[in-house]
Amino acid sequence: ADSIAIVTAPWEVVTVENGIVHKRASIPFLYQGAQSINILEINPKAGKKIGIAFTGQLEKISRIARKHQAIGAINGSYFDMTKGNSVCFLKVGSQVVDTTSLDELKLRVTGAVYEKKGKVKLIPWDRQIEKNYKKNKGSVLASGPLMLKDGEYYDWSQCNANFIETKHPRSAICLTEEGKILFVTVDGRSPENAVGINIPELAHLLHVLGGKDALNLDGGGSTALW
């Protein structure tokens, strides 16, 4: 029933520019409640490139995006709400900005966005992989959990059960079987319009949308798509 609700939803589709499409749907009943979903679909074949941007302080995603002259942007990974720094591995070019805390590795960080020359991969992540990537070329942002890998559901059983099972607003990045990149946000904390979803539900949503690889980026009040 949930798969049918996603496929038959009245998606509003707006072409932002060549190679970038914004899709939005309000679905009255999906995963036990109302859902509000936004997707920015990027086609790399149209010459669109992805990059990882960061700021040394707390700033709105819209401001960071404008600084980098981005067409679209999504918030990524977990941060210290007091200091504003990432608590997950963040490497931009040759600069290692932050490393993943042990707490985050235990809680949920099992994947990462790896970007090199505007091309993106979603890869598994752990402490040993992090050590190896400090010297690798390209930019990296660790996050999690990794939800899909090669079209299959990824194992998130070692992650914190409460984080996995609780419905929240969510942000995610997904690479589709067709080679497109999806920035996806699901709103939440609004019982009448958007109840939010948990990780198994988000993984299912992205699988139905044609996802091959998918990574949860963040959630809660930080969820933002620009």
Tell me what each language-model feature is.
Residues A1-W226:
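Gly/Ser/Thr/Pro-rich low-complexity, intrinsically disordered segments
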